[in-house]
Regions:
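N-terminal intrinsically disordered/low-complexity leader segments
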Residues: 1-6, 194-200
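Generic hydrophobic, amphipathic alpha-helix propensity
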Residues: 7-15, 32, 57-68
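Helix-turn-helix
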Residues: 10, 18-52, 56
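Alpha-helical DNA-contacting segments of helix-turn-helix folds
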Residues: 47, 53-61, 103, 123
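Hydrophobic alpha-helical connector segments
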Residues: 56, 70-96
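Amphipathic alpha-helical packing segments from all-alpha helical-bundle domains
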Residues: 70, 112-153, 180-183
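Amphipathic alpha-helical segments used for helix-helix packing
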Residues: 94-118, 164-168
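Hydrophobic/aromatic-rich alpha-helical bundle segments in the mid-to-C-terminal region
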Residues: 138-185, 196-200
Length: 200
């Protein structure tokens, strides 16, 4: 790893640690660089400000989770494969509540924002388009790309809402009790989008 990449990653990891302790709003650039054991000026070689760092952090987290989830999916049936993909993400987020909170507050932006090639999502300019490239066979050819992206984003936002509900202290169901309901909804969405498209 080059010194430049190492410093950039070191700053990112330091920020993640401090954000989790103090919250992003109460964290200063100086706090981050003290944790990273780097000079204050080094920060501005890689990030324009704290918000720029936070945005890149959210994209890094999202792409890492998505890439790792995709590696675990081996089912031949496209719907069951997608459910396996969602299941991996749920388990990860439930085990990492801070990352769940960070991503849930930025879910729509994270899915749709344009990304650069260095995020590792080959042949896609957003996280959502990367997912569509992997799961395009869930849809009929008559669906437009915009329709496909909307449906995928809908299922992922429902997933995120489910995770947030599960970690509430007064949640009436555990995540293991919620999963079958969520997966049934996903199956219904993808089993029915091919039948009389958008019929009311």
């Amino acid at each position: 790893m080059s010194d430049e990449i190492n410093k950039k990653e070191k700053i990112m990891q330091a920020a993640l640690k401090i954000f989790e302790k103090k919250g992003a709003e109460k964290t200063s650039v100086r706090d981050i660089m003290t944790e990273a054991n780097l000079g204050l000026g080094t920060f501005y070689l890689y990030y324009s400000d704290k918000n720029d760092l936070k945005e890149k952090m959210v994209l890094n987290l999202a792409t890492d989770i998505i890439l790792n989830a995709e590696k675990t999916c081996i089912q031949e049936d496209p719907i069951e494969r997608y459910i396996s993909f969602v299941d991996f993400i749920i388990d990860y987020l439930i085990s990492h509540p801070f990352e769940l909170d960070l991503l849930s507050k930025n879910i729509t932006w994270t899915l749709y924002t344009k990304i650069e090639n260095d995020y590792g999502l080959s042949e896609a300019d957003s996280t959502l388009k990367f997912i569509l490239n992997k799961y395009d066979n869930l849809f009929l050819t008559s669906h437009t790309e915009s329709e496909k992206l909307y449906i995928l984003s809908l299922t992922l936002e429902i997933m995120m809402s489910t995770c947030k509900s599960a970690v509430l202290e007064d949640s009436i169901l555990t995540i293991d009790e919620m999963k079958p309901v969520l997966f049934a909804i996903i199956r219904k969405i993808f089993n029915r989008i091919g039948e009389n498209k958008w019929k009311r």
